[in-house]
Amino acid sequence: MILDEILKKTREDLKRRKKMLSFELLGRSLSANPYMPRDVIKALKSTPNEPFKLICEIKKASPSKGVIREYFKPVEIAREYEKAGADAFSVLTEPHFFKGDLEFISQIRRYTKMPILRKDFIIDEYQILEALVYGADFVLLIAKALSLKELKKLLEFTHHIGLEALVEVHDKKDLLNATLSGANIIGINHRDLNDFSLHMNLAEELVPLIPNGKIIVAESGLNSREQLVNLNKVGVDAFLIGEHFMRQNDICAAVREMKGV
């Protein structure tokens, strides 16, 4: 299974990084460069003028598609997104399967005040602290990759240091764990991380099961404004879109088309 392979590599990388820089020393670096995270909930809440929000992803590659964007300049892409009216950024930091890098976050943070999601396979508090140090505002927690106990612990730590989390689900069991963990933002991923197949009706099936008061995000396989409008009608507040935008020559125009402006 692809998810298992990614998690194995993540554990190996994490062990190496902890040896290079301890949790304590990583935390101390914040005092030299304090960062105040943005209000992610406010950024993703719909308004009368904006019935849904866009989290625009900065992604070079994926395990299922290989390299998606050859000419890949994270800061340039972020600037195009911001100019087009994006509401937040999602930045891939997983290096082996997605060609990501934590440095992408710090590079982008220098040029924007937009909320940034660290999108990675997070299994340890160390990675969440890294996200804060590098300038992220929220992190991805994948329910499928964590036990309920682990999810609760990581979410509690995330909130403790002032960050927010997008808790990603793919089925009813994931959703139950996300709800029990106290997640404020629940992301419904149409893509099965075990085999990377798409199930495009998933959001419509799971949205009615989500308690009131949560920010609901739909992820993967989204490539038309019609999809967004229809999912917004059933209760989705925001959409995380990556591959569709990464394949465009004119990213700015593609984002504006999705927003209907």
From Swiss-Prot:
SUPFAM superfamilies, alphabetically? Ribulose-phoshate binding barrel
Pathway per the UniProt entry: Amino-acid biosynthesis; L-tryptophan biosynthesis; L-tryptophan from chorismate: step 4/5
Q: Which Pfam families does UniProt cross-reference here?
A: IGPS
Domain of life according to the entry: Bacteria
Q: Does the keyword Lyase apply?
A: yes
Which Enzyme Commission numbers does its entry carry? 4.1.1.48
User: Kind of enzyme, top EC level?
Assistant: lyase
Question: Catalysed reaction(s)?
Answer: 1-(2-carboxyphenylamino)-1-deoxy-D-ribulose 5-phosphate + H(+) = (1S,2R)-1-C-(indol-3-yl)glycerol 3-phosphate + CO2 + H2O
Question: Which key words tag this protein in UniProt?
Answer: Amino-acid biosynthesis, Aromatic amino acid biosynthesis, Decarboxylase, Lyase, Tryptophan biosynthesis
What is a GO molecular function of this protein? Answer: phosphoribosylanthranilate isomerase activity
Q: Which InterPro entries match?
A: Aldolase_TIM, Indole-3-glycerol_P_synth, Indole-3-glycerol_P_synth_dom, Indole-3-GlycerolPSynthase_CS, RibuloseP-bd_barrel
Gene Ontology BP, a term = L-tryptophan biosynthetic process
Q: In which family does this protein belong, per the annotation?
A: Belongs to the TrpC family.
For this entry, the protein name equals Indole-3-glycerol phosphate synthase
The source organism is Campylobacter hominis (strain ATCC BAA-381 / DSM 21671 / CCUG 45161 / LMG 19568 / NCTC 13146 / CH001A)
Q: What taxonomic lineage is listed for the species of origin?
A: Bacteria, Pseudomonadati, Campylobacterota, Epsilonproteobacteria, Campylobacterales
- Name the gene that codes for it: trpC
